[in-house]
Structures are given as structure tokens and as C-alpha cells.
Amino acid sequence: MAARSAGSGGWEVVKRGRRPGASSGGRGGGGGSDRRALGEANGVLKYDLSSPIQTTSTLYERGFEKIMKRQNKEQVPPPAAESKKPINKKQPKKVTAVPSQNQKQGPFRRLEDALKALDVAALQKELDKSQSVFTGNPSVWLKDLASYLNYKLQTPRMEPTLSQYPHDYPYSLVSRELRGIIRGLLTKAAGSVELFFDHCLFTMLQELDKTPGESLHGYRICIQAVLQDKPKIVTSNLDKFLELLRSHQSRPAKCLTIMWALGQAGFTNLTEGLKVWLGIMLPVLGIKALSPFAIAYLDRLLLMHPNLTKGFGMIGPKDFFPLLDFAYMPNNSLSPSLQEQLCQLFPRLKVLAFGAKPESSLHTYFPSFLSRATPSCPAAMKKELLASLTQCLTVDPLSTSVWRQLYPKHLSQSSLLLEHLLKSWEHIPKKARKSLQETIQSLKVTNQELLKKGSGGSEHVLTCDTACKGLLQRARGPRPPWARLFLLLLVFAVGFLCHDLRSNSSLQASLTGRLLRSSGLLPVGQQVCARLSSYSLQSYNWLQETLPACGSHLLAVVQPSLQLAWTHIYAIFSFLSAHCASYLACFSDSLAGFFQRVQLPEALQQLFHALKELLLLFCHSVLLPTWHLLLAALAQVQEHCHEACRGDVTWDCIKTQLSRAAQWTWLCLQDVTVAFLDWALTMISQQ
């Protein structure tokens, strides 16, 4: 015990009584130092854990009471007092030995160095001693383990989430021997593991209040070791930990520490990880300081578990649609970069939400999808909503009945969906088209009823009705081109018949004739041909008798009008040929004078000058030559009429010339048709 000297007013070191424990502690520098370090680390854990856990703090303090008294009695005197007191020769050894035992080792730069320097044998010795002293209290063993590791593994304090390191850091750096010690002790104290987890978490939170405070690697290692085997310690008490998180909402460092600790339960099991994320991190999504870690944790969780089947059934509509709003709604509490990151994760979240049997679950998502698909929603969100609605309609048959019920109250959203279906009809599976066609037919009837009632939103009703008609037309498919098919068959039949007749020289020897005879159609055909020939002859005789009289009467009625019209047309063309050229020249001169009188900007003058040159060029190069050619053609026609009619151009003469022209045209067409048929038969015979 250190006492005040009466003579000099300084400090002197007084030896304790001769107890075996004290003498052995003085001799064994390594073991005594470790034990005092453990006692010192345990001595500072004076925090209130009355809620939510109950610990055996009284027994824990009683067990280490002797160690604490020994440390207090062996206090090192202040350095200023040492120089005032002459010290005995034996005392310096004792004074220098005590600081070497109690002085806290400085932090290592790297955790790897601290783990290499850790004496695992000394740790095992301390744990054996703790188990022998506190035989019936395994929670004290676990606390000793965490305190010892945290005391020995001191490095500069890191940010709470360890985002720059792998997900299993720092436990991944622990050696196999140390892992065996930790796992063995956790197995022995299996009944106290949950209390031990709470102890580590609350101790970490209390260390964050201290300045500068210790690094928390020892507690982190213990938390990771516990949750690797027992993640349900966290997931069975999510409400308690969420309340703890909300109570520290004003302290981001503590919140991130809690989120990191609870998140360790999900890296070995996707189901437990999703429970943690949905129960702890989704409620705080949107808080500026906590959102980056929440989304980064979800990204890492889904990346570590590419097989999403183990997470089916974890995300329901209650959790899915807030995520949809966070991902796609603009101006929410997430930054654009976090929104983009969440959008990239959204397809996998959809797979988790829809589950193993989407054909029986998607109809529960349809109403919320439809209510959000408004014309004013953002383009990216609209695209995602329409794709999801189409998936619901094509995968789950019950979605169509849900749509029919919601249709009258969601006309604007339904119009967008119908237009999207019309655009993507070719990509819809054929099995789903039939049910969609029935649904669209029902919606069309609803549209007609709404239009008759004249209710509000008639614009949306008209849009929906137009889209329904287009979809029904697409569903029925294009009409077959019957006219083209008939024409093709007719051409093929005529070609085959011509080829058959030409190759066999007669109908009797041809294949067509033999087929007609064998089928009994030839006699019937001959009778039909005879009747047609008789009727045709009668018709010709009737026309021969009546047509001249009708033609003469028609000519007598129409001839005066036609002659008058011909006279006027001839006069008009004569007038135009005499006066049009002079008017065109006059118009050109007046246009040039107009441009000279009007004062315009230089750019406009250049533009008008270019247009003038273009018009003059067009007039001289196109209009005038065309006009002269037309006049020459009319003159030639007039001269030809005078020559053909021998000077007197009458209607009878013109009629005769027109009939000759028609006859010549008909002969030309016959020649062309015969040549084409010859060519077609040649091509068919070559095949």
C-alpha cells in the first residue's frame, strides 16, 4: 500500500502482507499482468442493463474484488513526488516493476499485428482460472473472454460499419486456434449466449460515449462468433432491438453500430438476413445517415446468396411497395445515387416478393400496381409498373377478375395499361391471350355502359374504348386476303389449262378433258356451253337490231352539244395561244419593277433575286417549252383531223377516228396479252 511519509512529505511504497497470491503475482510478470488487465477491463463495465437484459453484475464484481483491491493498493506514485524522496536501493526494482505490469499496452496500427501479438495460451489460462473461480456462472466466463480480447486487440478506432472490409471482418482474421477456444467456450456456456450477445452490444454502445474510447474488435469478434451459429438470437427479438435503435436515433454512430451487429445474423442464412433487413433496416430507410448502410447491406446480402429460393415468402406487399416507392418516386428522402442502387436491386426483390408460385400470388399485388400507374407518374416508374401489371395478367389468371372489379374506378390507369398491352401484344404468351381477350371484351361492354351514362372521365373512357377495339382486332388476327388468293388460284388454273391444251393439241386428248370425262363433268359442261352459246347469239342479235336505232337517237340528242363544246374548246386554245405569252412577259416585267421599288434588307433582296432567277429559269425552261409543245400537238391534231375528214371536221368524222383508235388499242392489248401468255407457258414448261 502506498502511504504518505511523515518526514519528507513524499510517497513511499509499503510491501503487502506475505500472501501467496501476492508474491506469486509479483514473480509471474506475464500472468499477473494479464489477470490485472482482465480485471481492469471488467472493472470499467459499470453500465445500466436493467432494460432489456438482466446480468449477474453483483457476482461478477464480487469475484474480481480481490484483484481490484490489489490494483488500488499498488498505485504508482506521481512522478513529481519521486524526486523529493530519497529511495532505498531495493525500492526502485519494485517501483519499476509495478508500472510494467499495470500500464496499458498502446494500440497497434493494424488488427493483424494485434492478433499476432495475442498470447492464446495466456488467454486459455485466464479462461480456465475464471471457470474454476465461477464454476456455476458461465456468463462470467463469456464476459471475461470478451473483455480480455477487447483489451488486447486495441487499434485506432474505425468507422462503425467497417464498410471498407469484408463482411466477416474482423472474425476472418482470427486464427484457427483462437476460434476453437471461442467456439468451445460458447458451447460450454450455451445457455448464456443470448445474454452475452446483449452484453457485447451494450458495452460497445457505452464505449462509443467515451473519449477517446477503446476500439471494439474483441466485442465484434464475439458477436460474429455467436451469430454464425445462432442467428435467431437477433431475429427472435427484432422488436426489442428496433426499439433500442430508435432510442439512439439522434446518435448515428450508435445506430450504425447496432445495425452492423444485428446484420451479422444474415450472412450465413438468407432468411434470417431478410428478417433483419425488413425488421430493422427498412424502418429506418430514408434517414440520411443510416440509408447508405441499409442499402449496402441489402446489396451485399443478395450478392452473397444468389439462390433466392431460400428467401421466398419473406417479402410481402406490405414491405414490397414501400421499396417500390423508395426506388422510383422522385424527391424522396433517398439521394439519386441510392435510388439508382436500389433500382438495380429491384428485379431480385421482385423475385423474392412474388415467391415460388407467382401464378397464385400476383393478383394480390395487382391493385397496388394499378393504383400507382397514373399518367403523371415518372417515366421509369411507369415502365416498371406497366411491365409488372402485364406480368400479373399473363401469369396469374385471377388478376383479370381483379382488374374487372377495379376498372370503373381506375379508368386513367387502365387506359395506360390497355395502350401498353396494344403495343406489346406480340410479346404476350399465346396461352394468356385468350383470357385477356375475354377480359377486354368485358371491358368494352363496360365502356359502352359508361358512355351511355355520361359519367365523368369520358376522355379516359373513349381512350379505353379505342384501345379495347384495337386489342380485339389484334386478338382476332388479320383477315385472310381472299381476293388475292382467288386471283392467284385463277391465274394458276388458267395457266395450267393453257399449258395442258397446248401440249396435247386438243381438249379431248388433254389431261383436263380426261378428268372431265371420268368425273362426268364434260357432258354437263358441253350442255352449259351450248346454252351459253345460244344465249350469247340471241343477245348479239338483239344488240344488232336495237343498238343502231339507240345510237342514232343518242347521237341526234348529244351531237349539237358536243359540236358546241368542241367550238368553245377550240376558241379557248386559240385565245390562249395568242395572248398567254404576252401576259407571262408582262408579269415578269411587273415583278422586276416591284422588287426595284421596294426597299428591303440586303439578305431579303438576295433571296428574292434568287427566287426571281429560279422562276425565270422555270418559266423559260419548263413552262414555255411545255406550252409550245402543247400548241404544236393541238395543231398536229387539228391538221390530222382536217386530213382525215378531208377538210370538213364533223362529229361523224371524229367518231370514226375514235373508233379506229379504240380498235388499234384493242389489237395492241391483244398482242401484248398473247405475248405474255406465251412467255408464262414457256416458263411453266421449263419448270
From Swiss-Prot:
Pfam families: TMEM214
Chain positions found as N-acetylalanine: 2
InterPro entries listed in its UniProt record: TMEM214
Localization in the cell: Endoplasmic reticulum membrane
Main location: endoplasmic reticulum
Top-level taxon: Eukaryota
Region (Disordered): 1-38, 70-108
Compositionally biased intervals (Gly residues): 23-32
Topology with respect to the bilayer: Multi-pass membrane protein
GO cellular component entries: cytoplasmic microtubule; cytosol; endoplasmic reticulum membrane; Golgi apparatus
Glycosylation (residues): 269, 307
Keyword set includes Glycoprotein: yes
Gene Ontology biological process terms from the UniProt entry: apoptotic process
Keywords for this protein: Acetylation, Apoptosis, Endoplasmic reticulum, Glycoprotein, Membrane, Transmembrane, Transmembrane helix
Record-annotated membrane-spanning stretches: 481-501, 614-634
Chain's role: Critical mediator, in cooperation with CASP4, of endoplasmic reticulum-stress induced apoptosis. Required or the activation of CASP4 following endoplasmic reticulum stress.
Complexes and interactors: Constitutively interacts with CASP4; required for the localization of procaspase 4 to the ER.
UniProt family annotation: Belongs to the TMEM214 family.
Record's protein name: Transmembrane protein 214
Native source organism of the sequence: Mus musculus
Gene this chain is encoded by: Tmem214
